[in-house]
């Protein structure tokens, strides 16, 4: 630990010697004051004009990320395990569910880099750590958005066209391959710095693609990645889930109208009422998924557009940590959406982890048979 302090002090002395403005006073220093000179070129100048945050802020964020990591890995690990191990859940549609949980899980694999940097007050792992952080973050972020879009497409087909829209294992595998092929060009371009690059942001403890360099190439890159990794998936998700919700409520309205014509209270039997409940849960889960996706990625999208095209002074180091926290928080919440809205997942989890005391009752066989088409969409909608 003592050698680490000596090293930090040495780098700090060299850095401030080359950048005298980095030390504002004995107590106040600019971000990057302790970064080795050869690493400074990888940091956008925008961040180097801000004073470093209090040590307690970095410690707080590091501790928060430890919590995010544990919660996400536990929750998504359970989802991957249960959906892969349970025969009743190994359906083609659920391959997409597993991939989404895998993306959320892998998103947190890189957080030890952030945690280490936070507890060492800055860019401690340097350019190599930044590249690893950026590669994993880009793959998981873009792949998660595309996976959500394909899940919405699959649910739309199964619910609105149950006879023609059935998913097969071949289709699901092809979608997964396409998702990672779709993400790869963006990652390779940034890693090789042929178009864009991975750079530290905020408190210099996390990394993302460069949205601050003031040139045409950077602005074009930001516009393209924003469109293809955010606008396209968001448009698909919004369209397909809105169609699902519209279909469910149109179906309910048609049944009510027919019941009125026949002077009966309801056309549904007890089995149909179970199906009705499932349909309402589909609608609620669809809205929840849309909301979570928007909450997690809209702040990042807005921030990158401001950096490339707007007033950069709005992007303070503290403000840019908020979008990063939003993404990690949603990666923690997603598994609990499964647990709340997917009875079959809850049943399988209860079998394997009885100590969780989920108390999920097995559905009646008649209800299961009648709602097989409905529950299958419900599984992936909860993704």
Curated annotation (Swiss-Prot):
Keyword Transmembrane helix: yes
Region (Disordered): 362-383
Cytoplasmic topological segments: 83-94, 154-171, 249-284, 342-383
Alphabetized UniProt keyword annotations: Chromophore, Disulfide bond, G-protein coupled receptor, Glycoprotein, Membrane, Phosphoprotein, Photoreceptor protein, Receptor, Retinal protein, Sensory transduction, Transducer, Transmembrane, Transmembrane helix, Vision
Compositionally biased residues, Low complexity: 369-383
InterPro entries to which the protein is assigned, alphabetical: GPCR_opsins, GPCR_Rhodpsn, GPCR_Rhodpsn_7TM, Opsin, Retinal_BS
TM ranges: 58-82, 95-119, 134-153, 172-196, 221-248, 285-308, 317-341
SUPFAM superfamilies: Family A G protein-coupled receptor-like
Compartments reported by the entry: Membrane
Post-translational modification: Phosphorylated on some or all of the serine and threonine residues present in the C-terminal region.
Ranges in a coiled coil: none
Example GO biological process: G protein-coupled receptor signaling pathway
Stored Pfam families: 7tm_1
Topological domain spans for side Extracellular: 1-57, 120-133, 197-220, 309-316
Function: Visual pigments are the light-absorbing molecules that mediate vision. They consist of an apoprotein, opsin, covalently linked to cis-retinal.
Family, as annotated: Belongs to the G-protein coupled receptor 1 family. Opsin subfamily.
Miscellaneous section: Each Drosophila eye is composed of 800 facets or ommatidia. Each ommatidium contains 8 photoreceptor cells (R1-R8), the R1 to R6 cells are outer cells, while R7 and R8 are inner cells.
Protein name, as recorded: Opsin Rh3
Organism, scientific name: Drosophila melanogaster (Fruit fly)
The organism's taxonomic lineage, starting at the top: Eukaryota, Metazoa, Ecdysozoa, Arthropoda, Hexapoda
Name of encoding gene: Rh3
């Amino acid at each position: 630990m003592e050698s680490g302090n000596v090293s930090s002090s040495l780098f700090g002395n060299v850095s401030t010697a080359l950048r005298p403005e980095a030390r504002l006073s004995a107590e106040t220093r600019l971000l990057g004051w302790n970064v080795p000179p050869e690493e400074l070129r990888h940091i956008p100048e925008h961040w180097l004009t801000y004073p470093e945050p209090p040590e307690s802020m970095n410690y707080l964020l590091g501790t928060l990320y430890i919590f995010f990591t544990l919660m996400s890995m536990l929750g998504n690990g359970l989802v991957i395990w249960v959906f892969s191990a349970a025969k009743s859940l190994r359906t083609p549609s659920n391959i997409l569910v597993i991939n989404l949980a895998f993306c959320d899980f892998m998103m947190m694999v890189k957080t030890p880099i952030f945690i280490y940097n936070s507890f060492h007050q800055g860019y401690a792992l340097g350019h190599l750590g930044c590249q690893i952080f950026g590669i994993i973050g880009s793959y998981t972020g873009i792949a998660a958005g595309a996976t959500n879009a394909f899940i919405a497409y699959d649910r739309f087909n199964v619910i609105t066209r149950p006879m023609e829209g059935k998913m097969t294992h071949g289709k699901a595998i092809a979608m997964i391959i396409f998702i990672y092929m779709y993400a790869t060009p963006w990652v390779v371009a940034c890693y090789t710095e042929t178009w864009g690059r991975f750079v530290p942001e905020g408190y210099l403890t996390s990394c993302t693609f460069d949205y601050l360099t003031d040139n045409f190439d950077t602005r074009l890159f930001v516009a393209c990645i924003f469109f293809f990794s955010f606008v396209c998936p968001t448009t698909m998700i919004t369209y397909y889930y809105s169609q699902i919700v519209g279909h469910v409520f149109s179906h309910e309205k048609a049944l009510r109208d027919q019941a009125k014509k026949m002077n009966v209270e309801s056309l549904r039997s007890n089995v149909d009422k179970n199906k009705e409940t499932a349909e309402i849960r589909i609608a609620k889960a669809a809205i929840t998924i849309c909301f979570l996706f928007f909450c997690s990625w809209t702040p990042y999208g807005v921030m990158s557009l401001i950096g490339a095209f707007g007033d950069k002074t709005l992007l303070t180091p503290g403000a840019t940590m908020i979008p990063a926290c939003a993404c990690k928080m949603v990666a923690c919440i997603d598994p609990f959406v499964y647990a709340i809205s997917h009875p079959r997942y809850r049943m399988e989890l209860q079998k394997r982890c009885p100590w969780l005391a989920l108390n999920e009752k097995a559905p009646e066989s008649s209800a299961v048979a009648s709602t097989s088409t409905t529950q299958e969409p419900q599984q992936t909608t909860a993704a």
